[in-house]
Amino acid sequence: MIKSALLVLEDGTQFHGRAIGATGSAVGEVVFNTSMTGYQEILTDPSYSRQIVTLTYPHIGNVGTNDADEESSQVHAQGLVIRDLPLIASNFRNTEDLSSYLKRHNIVAIADIDTRKLTRLLREKGAQNGCIIAGDNPDAALALEKARAFPGLNGMDLAKEVTTAEAYSWTQGSWTLTGGLPEAKKEDELPFHVVAYDFGAKRNILRMLVDRGCRLTIVPAQTSAEDVLKMNPDGIFLSNGPGDPAPCDYAITAIQKFLETDIPVFGICLGHQLLALASGAKTVKMKFGHHGGNHPVKDVEKNVVMITAQNHGFAVDEATLPANLRVTHKSLFDGTLQGIHRTDKPAFSFQGHPEASPGPHDAAPLFDHFIELIEQYRKTAK
């Protein structure tokens, strides 16, 4: 039985469609993502916590879903908005169609709306708070009330909400289409011990570090610097994550203590912003953020262009960079800062997602640079 669904934005704009997920309501910041596929990775990316994701590609759900494509243990997106859900999910890896997957994870979703109109609105007015109501006779007035009651992501610390409850080890590398998920690697195959802060870490980041010889200890977002230093790490990784970086004072304090040592530090996405804040820079909320797998970024030091995956609604304000931070990468879409490197410490970060999943791997060599810094540190400090 087809059920109705309604999306209402805080400005009062209404989109009527049909429900393809759970019955109920979802409230969050409405953003758009331009990736053509990879919807399951997007839904399970913790960076989308408290956000309703609009996918601009018209056909979503063609290849179904499977366990291997999940970037975390649950769906973190607050809701999903698409143009069209195909009648058939066809792929040799498919184990469950998208609609069933959404219902099983209790995710409210709407289809059959004009996503081009919605995307234009978000580009012109900026990301807006919104509410999806799915079920019989959805109440537009109630949806508007809920959308306007949502406080927004400014000032919202979500890293401590999505982080792991306890520390754990990770030694699994990348999987292949033919071989599936690999067995965990043995410790003697992983010469580098890296402590990774989980601010909302994606699994493919962890896999790419393991591929390069890292034995990972994943720690909760609020783990103190003292506890991490007792683990005697060869490197410290700062993961991606949702929300506003500025309220994460616990992480900023820890990073500042790491920067008093010579241990290499590598940050991605939220981790990039936290490294900048710990170094004295400031961050700002973007109009509608960067969300997609086709964003051109210039490596200003090598004078080359990379096509990258992006997912962030905050950015580091380049005008506030202290003297000990140099710019390494910039967005060719809007000129915003994409990468920094400390001039006095082996610490650097990237705003985009070099692990992709979904997206291109042009920025993957950033992981190799982290390993180079670790090898130099081990030679001089140990």
From Swiss-Prot:
Gene Ontology cellular component list: carbamoyl-phosphate synthase complex; cytoplasm; cytosol
EC number: 6.3.5.5
Record domain Glutamine amidotransferase type-1: where: 193-380
Keyword terms of this UniProt record: Amino-acid biosynthesis, Arginine biosynthesis, ATP-binding, Glutamine amidotransferase, Ligase, Nucleotide-binding, Pyrimidine biosynthesis
Pathway per the UniProt entry: Amino-acid biosynthesis; L-arginine biosynthesis; carbamoyl phosphate from bicarbonate: step 1/1; Pyrimidine metabolism; UMP biosynthesis via de novo pathway; (S)-dihydroorotate from bicarbonate: step 1/3
Active site location: C269, H353, E355
Reactions catalysed according to its record: hydrogencarbonate + L-glutamine + 2 ATP + H2O = carbamoyl phosphate + L-glutamate + 2 ADP + phosphate + 2 H(+)
A Gene Ontology molecular function term of the record: carbamoyl-phosphate synthase (glutamine-hydrolyzing) activity
Name of the protein described by the UniProt record: Carbamoyl phosphate synthase small chain
Organism: Escherichia coli (strain K12)
Gene of this entry: carA
